[in-house]
């Protein structure tokens, strides 16, 4: 076992680590958000196939199957390889989107749609690898890191929305403008994913404060950090962690962790059941025609993403962070009222009220998500925090998948179905 004096004492680089965590958060969602944000292009190509709903189900089905599998084996997995593989898969997937569009000349054929679904399935696989690995890894570090990573998830949505509005404005009146904007958009996402591969592989593990937390977690019995310790030049500590006798490691089982945190897990699922039952399918297909015309849906998506991103920074201000589990539960349950609110707003109100509701949907989604992920790992050692982070991701993706499936209910009685 690693001696206390072997643990790096230098913990400089906290701000750099937060910045890298934020960028890695952007990279873990920018590929999928790019798909969601250019959905208007895919509706032009495949108007009869409900692309926003179908692609989301494909993505979430694959992500859920693999995140459950990976979460059950998290203690024995190489976190470093898991993250590198996930970000590399994101990079390959976004590049394949460009190749597919160029090869099919932007046609809306069934073959192109099937291939598009397969690429989206790759994104789901990448999500399962990256989300659990990154959240689990950051859960035994400073709470600021998990907040920065979660903020990055929100920034990914806001960034893609802003870029989408810019490209739509630039190419709106040009021939084949929607397609040109979408290709430029996916190209930018590919570069971001590639940057994440290099950042995680070459930079993150070597930051002094990251070395400190990983060496500390290794001392507590977290074997998942072994490869990252070796990559950071801490060969001796990595070898000691690798050879550690698991029977001597004191930690709670996954069932015990689940019992102690089932309230947070259910709350996290409910947050995303509500969000994904509305966003993005309802916003694209059930909000009617308004003065903004074909700008209406992209603007709604941008409002959601913008407020979701802003709200994820609020818990970093300590007095504004919600740590009470009871109050988190109250807020999550109250948020269920957004479903009938959106229904009646779409049916009877004007676009101003819809913009307000969409903004609140994003604001509450981001804020409550960060509060839960920041609260859950407190008081646990390295292996327990890593396991709990993976379990929370299972609840998150489960809620997203349930929300996506429930989103189809909006089509009942809809003449366009």
Curated annotation (Swiss-Prot):
<feature type="transmembrane region" description="Helical">
    <location>
        <begin position="54"/>
        <end position="74"/>
    </location>
</feature>
<dbReference type="GO" id="GO:0005337">
    <property type="term" value="F:nucleoside transmembrane transporter activity"/>
</dbReference>
<comment type="similarity">
    <text>Belongs to the SLC29A/ENT transporter (TC 2.A.57) family.</text>
</comment>
<dbReference type="InterPro" id="IPR002259">
    <property type="entry name" value="Eqnu_transpt"/>
</dbReference>
<feature type="transmembrane region" description="Helical">
    <location>
        <begin position="110"/>
        <end position="130"/>
    </location>
</feature>
<keyword id="KW-0813">Transport</keyword>
<feature type="transmembrane region" description="Helical">
    <location>
        <begin position="293"/>
        <end position="315"/>
    </location>
</feature>
<feature type="transmembrane region" description="Helical">
    <location>
        <begin position="392"/>
        <end position="412"/>
    </location>
</feature>
<keyword id="KW-0812">Transmembrane</keyword>
<dbReference type="InterPro" id="IPR036259">
    <property type="entry name" value="MFS_trans_sf"/>
</dbReference>
<keyword id="KW-1133">Transmembrane helix</keyword>
<feature type="transmembrane region" description="Helical">
    <location>
        <begin position="184"/>
        <end position="204"/>
    </location>
</feature>
<dbReference type="GO" id="GO:0015858">
    <property type="term" value="P:nucleoside transport"/>
</dbReference>
<feature type="transmembrane region" description="Helical">
    <location>
        <begin position="264"/>
        <end position="284"/>
    </location>
</feature>
<feature type="transmembrane region" description="Helical">
    <location>
        <begin position="143"/>
        <end position="163"/>
    </location>
</feature>
<comment type="function">
    <text>Nucleoside transporter that can mediate uptake of adenosine, uridine, guanosine or cytidine when expressed in a heterologous system (yeast).</text>
</comment>
<feature type="transmembrane region" description="Helical">
    <location>
        <begin position="19"/>
        <end position="39"/>
    </location>
</feature>
<dbReference type="Pfam" id="PF01733">
    <property type="entry name" value="Nucleoside_tran"/>
</dbReference>
<dbReference type="GO" id="GO:0005886">
    <property type="term" value="C:plasma membrane"/>
</dbReference>
<keyword id="KW-0472">Membrane</keyword>
<feature type="transmembrane region" description="Helical">
    <location>
        <begin position="84"/>
        <end position="104"/>
    </location>
</feature>
<feature type="transmembrane region" description="Helical">
    <location>
        <begin position="353"/>
        <end position="373"/>
    </location>
</feature>
<feature type="transmembrane region" description="Helical">
    <location>
        <begin position="326"/>
        <end position="346"/>
    </location>
</feature>
<keyword id="KW-1003">Cell membrane</keyword>
<protein>
    <recommendedName>
        <fullName>Equilibrative nucleotide transporter 7</fullName>
    </recommendedName>
</protein>
